């Protein structure tokens, strides 16, 4: 999708208030709890036996932080998401064989986490811009499959 100046402003201003470490851990943690089949990509992460184990797992938190950090890079390059994610796409698709559907799920979980954290500030308009953003990221990450 094409990002309007308004989309960019909306995404950037909310992103400035996001605690990448906290929100990253929560987003990846929720992904693994809500969509348990995604856990198979994280065999090396140790204890994922329950929701509380997952949410407290330091490796989940660390990778979640990494995920949102790369999302922050993307936010600086909304007009070239494909270029921004070329290497990550190669890694996740060619080497790890992650189903692209999982990128979409992660994006939806992130939107949920932002909604919880920002409450009323996360208006329908803000949600629309973010949904466009996570869809763009998912499709950029999946580009190796086409």
Swiss-Prot record:
CDD domains to which the protein is assigned, alphabetical: Hb-beta-like
Matching SUPFAM superfamilies: Globin-like
Expression across tissues: Red blood cells.
Keywords noted in UniProt: Heme, Iron, Metal-binding, Oxygen transport, Transport
Single biological process term from Gene Ontology: hydrogen peroxide catabolic process
The Globin domain, residue ranges: 2-146
GO molecular function annotations of the record: haptoglobin binding; heme binding; hemoglobin alpha binding; metal ion binding; organic acid binding; oxygen binding; oxygen carrier activity; peroxidase activity
A single Gene Ontology CC term: blood microparticle
Residues noted as binding heme b in the record, renumbered to the chain: 63, 92
Signal sequence, renumbered to the chain: none
Xref: PROSITE patterns: GLOBIN (PS01033)
InterPro entries cross-referenced by the UniProt entry: Globin (IPR000971), Globin-like_sf (IPR009050), Globin/Proto (IPR012292), Hemoglobin_b (IPR002337), Hemoglobin_oxygen_transport (IPR050056)
Function: Gamma chains make up the fetal hemoglobin F, in combination with alpha chains.
Annotated family: Belongs to the globin family.
PANTHER family in alphabetical order: HEMOGLOBIN FAMILY MEMBER, HEMOGLOBIN SUBUNIT GAMMA-1
Subunit comment: Heterotetramer of two alpha chains and two gamma chains in fetal hemoglobin (Hb F).
Extra information: The gamma-slow sequence is shown. The residues responsible for the gamma-fast sequence are not known.
Protein name per UniProt: Hemoglobin subunit gamma
């Amino acid at each position: 999708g094409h990002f309007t100046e308004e989309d960019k402003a909306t995404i950037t201003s909310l992103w400035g208030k996001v605690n990448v470490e906290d929100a990253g851990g929560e987003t990846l943690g929720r992904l693994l709890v809500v969509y348990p089949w995604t856990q198979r990509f994280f065999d090396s992460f140790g204890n994922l036996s329950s929701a509380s184990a997952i949410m407290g797992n330091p490796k989940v938190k660390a990778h979640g932080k990494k995920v949102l950090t790369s999302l922050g890079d993307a936010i600086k390059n909304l007009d070239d998401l494909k270029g921004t994610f070329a290497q990550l796409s190669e890694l996740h698709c060619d080497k790890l064989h992650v189903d692209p559907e999982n990128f979409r799920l992660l994006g939806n979980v992130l939107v949920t986490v932002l909604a919880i954290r920002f409450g009323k500030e996360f208006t329908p308009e803000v949600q629309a811009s973010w949904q466009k953003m996570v869809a763009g990221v998912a499709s950029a990450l999946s580009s190796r499959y086409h």
